[in-house]
Curated annotation (Swiss-Prot):
The modification Phosphoserine is found at S16. Residues 1-31 are cytoplasmic. Coiled coil: none annotated. The keyword NAD does not apply. The chain crosses the membrane at residues 32-52. The keyword Ribosomal protein does not apply. It holds the Pfam family Phospholamban. The gene is Pln. This is Phospholamban. It comes from Mus musculus (Mouse).
Amino acid sequence: MEKVQYLTRSAIRRASTIEMPQQARQNLQNLFINFCLILICLLLICIIVMLL
């Protein structure tokens, strides 16, 4: 069990040391924001349809 924890910790450390390019991070953030906006719009449409 301790070995698994150690492996996951070292993997997380390795992943965090890999620096993402600023552009890639910006693109990911934009995608995430767009996705959230689309979800909110769909929810609003569903609520309006149910109310009507």
